[in-house]
């Protein structure tokens, strides 16, 4: 071969070789690790001897500037958990992270810088298993009117993606049927007072113990009165308790009436109240009954949604009824009614 031609031929291939563009020949696949574990991320390059090779951490949402971790075979980040190895034979840069934390999750980008605005990149996604955390945009509590349509929403972050389920306090039946509902949104097409109470949103993904949010659902409804014993008998000069149970929300005003006159605490009547969240028990004790106190009494309950009334009739008996007359003097003398005495308890008619 002509010497000049050979020189041109060799020179041509030398120039081509010198101008070959660097490439990233290998990048690690997605990594899924536990908190406290260790991960190694590999990036292999070709034709990059004269170009800077960097590891960067890139925000998953691309809203924060990338964080430089290393350049060439040197670490930039000041974190003892990070280490870097460079294998010259394979041109592989291995980034090691020990004692992985939740904040380490994200994209790790291998970069070969060719020019000011020219670079080659490849990314590996590091996922860190983390327990569920219920999001702020989930329902916290609700106050609704009876008959309304209701949506209870529950969302949770974590990795793997959490599964969301719904339960009620004491495993009560859900409005949708059954004791468990799976899904982010629990829909109640027409809520009733029996649907009120605490609902549990439970998020689980197999990491940790899961997360739970208690959601209080208050249902506004007009008073509903139940009288355990509509007819009660008692002898003259003895006490008797008249009782009514009320369900309502908001809490109702409860009054007792006799002959359309509102009763109050005095020497003839003693009125007591016992309340839970939306259940109320009102008891009126008729003290040392006189003839005029026999008859019909009304328990009245009212809130902004409505009013209800129920009657209790008090009638005269010959023999005192225990309770509440246990231990009271009989017929005005000093003898006391013994618990062993044969007493007559007049049942509801």
UniProtKB/Swiss-Prot annotation:
Gene of this entry: LAC
Tissue-specificity statement: Expressed by all neurogenic cells early, but only those cells that become neuroblasts continue to express it. Expressed by neuroblasts, ganglion mother cells and neurons early in their lives, but expression becomes restricted to a subset of neurons as development progresses. Expressed by sensory neurons as they delaminate from the body wall ectoderm. It is also present on growing axons of the CNS and PNS and becomes restricted to a subset of axons later in development.
Limits of the Ig-like V-type domain: 22-127
Post-translational modification remark: The N-terminus is blocked.
Domain Ig-like C2-type: 132-218, 222-315
Positions of GPI-anchor amidated glycine lipidation: 332
Biological processes annotated in GO: cell adhesion
Keyword NADP assigned: no
A cellular component term, taken from the record's GO annotations: plasma membrane
Lineage, opening ranks: Eukaryota, Metazoa, Ecdysozoa, Arthropoda, Hexapoda
Domain of life: Eukaryota
Annotated protein name in UniProt: Lachesin
Glycan-modified residues: 137
Compartments in which it is found: Cell membrane
Topology within the bilayer: Lipid-anchor; GPI-anchor
Keywords from the UniProt entry: Cell adhesion, Cell membrane, Disulfide bond, Glycoprotein, GPI-anchor, Immunoglobulin domain, Lipoprotein, Membrane, Repeat, Signal
